[in-house]
Amino acid sequence: MRVKETLNLGKTKFKMRGNLPVKEVERQNVWAENKVYEQRQKLNEGKPSFILHDGPPYANGDIHMGHALNKITKDFIVRYKSMNGFRAPYVPGWDTHGLPIEQKLKQAGYDRKKMTDNEFRELCRKYALEQVDRQRDEFKRLGVAGEWDNPYLTLKPEFEAAQVRVFGAFAKRHLIYRGQKPVFWSWSSESALAEAEVEYHDVTSPSAFYGEHVIDGKGVLDDDTYMVVWTTTPWTIPASEGITIDASFDYVVVQPAGENRKFVLAAELLDENAERFGWEDVQVLKTVKGAELENILCEHPFDNSRHLVTMLGDFVTLDSGTGLVHTAPGYGEDDYRIGKQYDLPIFAPVDDKGFLTAEAGDDFAGVFYDDANKIALDKLKAAGLLLKYMPYEHSYPFDWRTKKPIIFRATPQWFASVGDMRDEILKSMDDVEFFPEWGKKRLYNMIRDRGDWVISRQRVWGVPLPIFYAEDGTAIMDEVTINHVADLFGKYGSNVWFERDAKDLLPDGYTNEHSPNGTFTKETDIMDVWFDSGSSHQGVLAERSYLDYPADLYLEGSDQYRGWFNSSLITSVAVSGHAPYKQVLSQGFTLDNQGRKMSKSLGNTIAPADVIKQMGAEIVRMWVASVDTSSDVRVSMESFKQVADSYKKFRNTVRFMLGNTADFDPKANRVAYEDLASVDQYMETRLNEFVAETKDHYDHYDFLDIYKKLINFLTVDLSNFYLDIAKDIMYIDAEDSHSRRSMQTVFYDVLVALTKLFTPMLPHTTEEIWPFLKEPEEFAQLAEMPAVQNYANSDELMAQWTRFMDLRSNVLKALEEARDAKLIGKSLEAHLDLYVDDDTQAFLDHLNTNVRQMLMVSALDLHALSDAPEDAETFGDTLAIKVGHADGDVCDRCRMVKTDVGSDEAYPMLCARCAAIVRENYPESVTTGLEA
């Protein structure tokens, strides 16, 4: 018989390598076949609900790392809640209308103008559904659990019907109106945009400083005076209707040397502009307050038959420019507001494609707006009005879909009034909890400062605005017509709007005083896609009986403060008077390792599919837990490799414990807590702390803290201590000994707790572990989270072992120094002499543990501190340590150096402890003998 055969060496079929890219797919197929998600939902029937409402990603293209970050985080939460006492169904959704799909069809060669609207819409629908299928497979491959066979889609008839009813709630409160005012206009999309559809990029614009000739100075300014105006959009000068100044600013009338003309500009900006214009010996003729310049008239620089009025506004700054702002009410929100105040015309001579119209003048007609800048500058120069041209770098709005710059343009649009219910919206946020906390202020400020919502779009692929027009042009959107349209959409889908004439979309026998002849027409615009997704609280939460409205949680990227969080809040307050969510959690963007936005053009993208193919979805999931998602997250293959190392640590730790509990039956072999060895009670209590901390972090969505705690628990508590000292008990002591069963009890409890706690994060791996445990549930996902125990005297126990760990740290330091001095090789070769004070001696006695075994040395003697020799190393005033080489020979079984090796003649290579264990448990070895 060989010595090795007498050891309890761990054995398990749980593999060291997970082969995740292959095994994950197999495991997901098993879940699908066994309907594990559905089983979990059935188990949770009757429990309190927790509803995480999915913000719908756009159905176009493969998912990117931002999608993975978001969906996996949601999966953490839903899985945890489902295992922790809540009914937590997850309904994924998709945003399926909008311009990008139209553009994809255009790129594929389809010409919208050569087919009917319904033919084009059908192509859009098919494309959207293809993209949904594509992304659904990719999300499922990440291991995300949910109702993948019953998602919500904004193109489904029941959703469109609910959306129309949301519109009806606005209309009922008289919050829908038709107006002509500047909106974000995308010439590349030929449509108005909402603020949430705009992104900003740094650009260089042509900046012009020019004079506008005073023709009526109201007794304040002479006729030979020029107002110095600044603009970064010279192409808008044909639509200029005035000059805006600030009533409280000081303005100066100056005359530079060699100039016959006088100029007006802000006093505070005189010096920098004089230098800019090359003015010398500037004489200040007069200083006046802005209020004194109100209503002064100037000549339009391109049309002397038009007059420009000087107005007082609150948006003029002294940060740059001249303190006088060129104002075109048809081309800007501030301009529009002050133009309305002064009753100016709203003039925007530019068409849908960005080309100036004949109203802009002969020189500009048919010219693309950006090209018109040069014409405007040339005209200013020819008229002697241009004082300075210079490039100006600033942030400028772009269409987030086409990535092309946009313009402000006054066009007739439908608006939802935000201003009329702003206070109600802001008040509704009082009861909403935000993660991070600053999110509340961010959303509050956005709602406080935003304008009314332009909800009309001049496109085809979307939900039509359910508005009819009477014979005299009166817009009809009463409760009767809107509910009827909603019913039609619910039955036939929104295609019915394009298939039928207006009269066939109205209720039978419908009459309206504004159409005495019974003739009606219908609106051709569709709704903003943010109205689509923003209505999901009605189209999904209120529509499905097993969901709740308001939802417990909305979780999306931080860009959704101006997107989905924003639009959903507005629509919910309009419908119900309250927020659609109880909590809002926002995440940062995924960037490359240099902090740049990922894009195909930069070649810096890392797709989830690439990482999954190489390392597995578990690594992507663990990576999500390992990063601080409250701010922007940098992504690199190196970061995934680092996480893969942590995953390997988790897997190997589990494998070691599985191997050492293979012969453990929790029903037959479990040792009660009060009968556990002291060190095992300590680890059981430490595990209990870990469970409590981890569950608390789950409850507060602190996944990074969970990851950190896991790595610390695996490394510090288990690998560096407990699993290290365990080998002397697990391998050496008799298989059924109390000491071994005591430790196996803790091993098993650690395994079960780790498996349950990390099923939300690493479901593929924990389900691989689960069959090795003797638990009643078929799948880990069907188990409940471990309960936090209330052990007696746990505080005292933890205090004692914390003190022991401090002593152990000093011992490890002394052993390291002894190794460096070549006194010993391995720690097991050491003989320790510990010199302790009376209090430490009493503490060690009370600890009731084998101190030598806990310190992993072959021999240990305790002495009074007063007996410490001079060459002992002191640690504070309670401990001194002397390290020497243990006397005796190495036992072939426990590898300790013992003086009693060979004391049993039958086992000459074993120490007395090992000989006794072998003699009792392997009696045949007495006659056959042992071989090394």
UniProtKB/Swiss-Prot annotation:
The keyword Metal-binding applies. ATP binds at K600. A motif ('HIGH' region) lies at residues 57-67. L-isoleucyl-5'-AMP binds at E556. Zn(2+) binds at C891, C894, C911, C914. Its cofactor is Zn(2+). GO terms for cellular component: cytosol. It is found in: Cytoplasm. Its EC number is 6.1.1.5. Binds 1 zinc ion per subunit. Catalyzes the attachment of isoleucine to tRNA(Ile). As IleRS can inadvertently accommodate and process structurally similar amino acids such as valine, to avoid such errors it has two additional distinct tRNA(Ile)-dependent editing activities. One activity is designated as 'pretransfer' editing and involves the hydrolysis of activated Val-AMP. The other activity is designated 'posttransfer' editing and involves deacylation of mischarged Val-tRNA(Ile). This is Isoleucine--tRNA ligase. It comes from Lactiplantibacillus plantarum (strain ATCC BAA-793 / NCIMB 8826 / WCFS1). The gene is ileS.
